[in-house]
Swiss-Prot record:
GO terms for molecular function: toxin activity. The keyword Secreted applies. Induces smooth muscle contraction. May target bradykinin receptors (BDKRB). This is Bradykinin-like peptide 3.
Length: 14
């Protein structure tokens, strides 16, 4: 997992 990984930010915003 990259640094700053968050369970709420698993994908880039569309």
């Amino acid at each position: 997992r990259p640094p700053g990984f968050s369970p709420f930010r698993v994908a880039p915003a569309s």
